[in-house]
Amino acid sequence: MERPSFLDQEPPAGYVPGIGRGATGFSTKEKQVVSNDDKGRRIPKRYRENLNNHLQSQPKDDEDDEAANVFKTLELKLAQKKKKRANEKDDDNSVDSSNVKRQFADLKESLAAVTESEWMDIPDATDFTRRNKRNRIQEQLNRKTYAAPDSLIPGNVDLNKLTEEREKLLQSQIDENLAQLTKNASNPIQVNKPNAATDALSYLKDLENDRVNSLSDATLEDLQKMRTILKSYRKADPTNPQGWIASARLEEKARKFSVAKKIIENGCQECPRSSDIWLENIRLHESDVHYCKTLVATAINFNPTSPLLWFKAIDLESTTVNKYRVVRKALQEIPRDEGLWKLAVSFEADKAQVIKMLEKATQFIPQSMDLLTAYTNLQSYHNAKMTLNSFRKILPQEPEIWIISTLLEERNNPDIPVDKLVSLLKEGLLELSKNGYKATLSAWLKRAEALNDAPNSNLTCQAIVYAILEWLRESGEYESELNNVDQILEKMPHSKVQIAVLKKLIQWDPCDTVLWSRLKMATESYHKIEELLAFFQELLFQTKNSDDIRANMREKSPGLLMMYVSEYWKAQKGDTRQTLVLIDQIIDFAPHNLDLRFFKIKLLGRSLQLDELRDFFQQTFSSLEDFKISGTERLYYKYVNFLRYQDLNEEAIKFLNERCLKSFPICHKFFLQLGQIYHSMGNIEMSRETYLSGTRLVPNCPLLWVSLSKIDEIDLKNPVRARSILDRGLLKNPDDVLFYIAKIQMEIRLGNLDQAELLVTQALQKFPSNALLWVEQIKLFKHGNKSSLKKTIFQDALRRTQNDHRVLLEIGVSFYAEAQYETSLKWLERALKKCSRYGDTWVWLFRTYARLGKDTVDLYNMFDQCEPTYGPEWIAASKNVKMQYCTPREILLRLMNDK
């Protein structure tokens, strides 16, 4: 086809393409030039013509051309600078990029070693922009539901076909799960079936736990699914009762009781030989007792040897006569059931019939030790021994028969010695070992623990422990069995068995203080402290080797004798006469035990037997004169205090100068006593001279320096010299914190609180964890006005001293001073829990109880058990010569009345 010629021609003037075909959307008018002023604003039409005429009429001059050239030159220069800057920037970017390439070159090369799995594990980059808002919107959209018409479902989807495929899939899964179940069900002999009906049994357990709960929280679909599964179980193995029981419990849970009963009835027809399904049927009909009796009778006809069904039949009967009748019928069917024989014995009132019944029961079940024990308990002593002898032949490896024999001997003769019972049990262990029985310590201790609370078994329990320990030791198995006895003792509770084990071990090693301490704790916890004292008395004076035991205890463990005397005195509730008799008895074979003599001195002083006390001192001096015994200076110290108690100061001074200081010239206690005697007599100069000579001979004793400084400060009113004395003592003992404390207390007494605070700060820098310094720091708050820092100081003190009981006490005292008694009580109880032997804590605790009006009976009982011994305030009272023979309770009352 030839090209049309008009396509190569020029269009006519005013030609607009498409306008002939009716095209629209464009203007056919000629575009007008829009006139604007210099600032870009549109010029109105009425001024345009005049403006054009004016511009055309105005001629161009050279200045305009020159200005235009200048501006053009400037624009060229600016353009060149801009271009140069861009080139430099590109060069910098190229350099930076090259540096980056070189920096990451090795990393790029290592990418070759990345495996495919590592590459896939690299997390994808996620968009965190407005993530929370997007998630919130998405959650809102997910919660929205919309109603959709059926027309939206495509017509080519076959719903019936889809349902059939789902049912096929579910059926295949059920068949796979039931494969093992069907296999096990078809096997008539199954000793152990851990995998049989596992799913059904687990589901049964869940239904049993939630049987009382409704299915309100389960959907209809889940309920139908469970029904389908259980139906498949029943269909696969209709003779398995677990499927029927599970289905019935499911319907029971769904509150469809009639359906559940119908299912379980069908199950009873399918599985009449299963006692479980009959019991489930009885449970579902438990409201109808008469029908339950019918069911249990039918069940017993099918299962006459099921003990559970017979026990259920017994429970359904309401009268004892009917119960006994059912029990007798059950025994005809199951004569070897121990529980039925026990029920029969409990229902029988005639003793003769019970004996006959137990005789028959032991013939059917000779291995039942409970029936044998009940049988021998009703027999006479002679007949019981014959019965046990016959059973030893039937059961030659049964150790319980020998234990029953021991109980029989104890019941027949309550005063029988333990040694005879031990011999009987050891004979039994020998016979058992001949028949292949191997005795173990743990097994026999468990047998003893089983008799721990049984009546008339105390001697037998002890004999079992003694017999097994002696048997293991004599049979050569001591190392293998008894090496772990400590671990066994730690796991055992405080009981008669533990006490018996400890007593036997102590008999083998009477000087073991650890075993004695354990025995003391066990007897105290079990409230058998008199048993500890009787055992002590037996070892020391009543056994064949008592002389050897006393000698070993005197040489190796003299503290055990003191423990015996102390516990005896507590048990006698302060009976001084009986305790003094015991002390004299022990002193006869342990004359050099000073602790016993000190205890006797304390008892004679508290009972105010001063003449006997003076005679005892003289007798002690004469008996120990030719022996060098450690602790003699304590004896002299107590004698000086005894003289001071009677105001025999001159005699005390003479005794100190002629005997004490000559025998012990560097004992600081004698210098302190001598100085205190002179001070009490008003001879201040001699008192100061005594302390001064003491500091020269014993310069490392801070008490002498402190006593000397107090003479100058308080008595001689010379605080400057007192400070100098403490400074000299500190120079000779730079690491003794007591000098800092003495200086701080002196400044507080003198009213120099700033100086005292400075000394505390200096001392804490050197001894940051010393509790006594922190106590002084807390005491300064009572004299100053820095209560705002109190909490901070408390926290620092507790942290640095690790909650020391003295710091806890001082915090409680500070709250007591502010009348915050409840808060003070809490801190004082914490301090007491931390250390119960600190006497000052008890004093302030009783003061707080008095302020709060609380009952102190229990607190006094705790106080009597603890017997506090130290604390500044407590020692100041207890070491007072006029109060040295006071009881702890008397000292407590005196201190409580002081404030």
Swiss-Prot record:
Renumbered residue ranges of the record's region Disordered: 1-65
Coarse class of the primary localization is nucleus
| SMART domains from the UniProt entry | HAT (SM00386), TPR (SM00028)
- Top-level taxon of the source organism: Eukaryota
Q: Does the keyword Iron-sulfur apply?
A: no
Tell me which UniProt keywords the record has, alphabetically: mRNA processing, mRNA splicing, Nucleus, Repeat, Spliceosome
Tell me which GO cellular component terms the UniProt record holds: catalytic step 2 spliceosome; nucleus; spliceosomal complex; U4/U6 snRNP; U4/U6 x U5 tri-snRNP complex; U5 snRNP
InterPro entries with a match to the protein in the record: HAT, PRP1_N, Syf1-like, TPR-like_helical_dom_sf, TPR_rpt
Q: Which GO terms describe its biological process?
A: mRNA splicing, via spliceosome; spliceosomal tri-snRNP complex assembly
Sequence ranges of the HAT repeats: 221-253, 255-287, 289-318, 319-350, 352-381, 383-414, 493-525, 545-578, 608-645, 648-680, 682-714, 751-783, 819-851
Q: Which Pfam families match?
A: PRP1_N
Bias (Basic and acidic residues): 28-51
Location in the cell: Nucleus
Query: Which cysteine pairs are covalently linked by disulfides here?
Result: none
Q: Give any extra note attached to this record.
A: Present with 2250 molecules/cell in log phase SD medium.
Subunit comment: Component of the U4/U6-U5 tri-snRNP complex composed of the U4, U6 and U5 snRNAs and at least PRP3, PRP4, PRP6, PRP8, PRP18, PRP31, PRP38, SNU13, SNU23, SNU66, SNU114, SPP381, SMB1, SMD1, SMD2, SMD3, SMX2, SMX3, LSM2, LSM3, LSM4, LSM5, LSM6, LSM7, LSM8, BRR2 and DIB1.
Q: What does this protein do?
A: Participates in pre-mRNA splicing. Part of the U4/U5/U6 tri-snRNP complex, one of the building blocks of the spliceosome.
Q: What is this protein called?
A: Pre-mRNA-splicing factor 6
| Organism of derivation | Saccharomyces cerevisiae (strain ATCC 204508 / S288c) (Baker's yeast)
This chain is encoded by the gene named PRP6
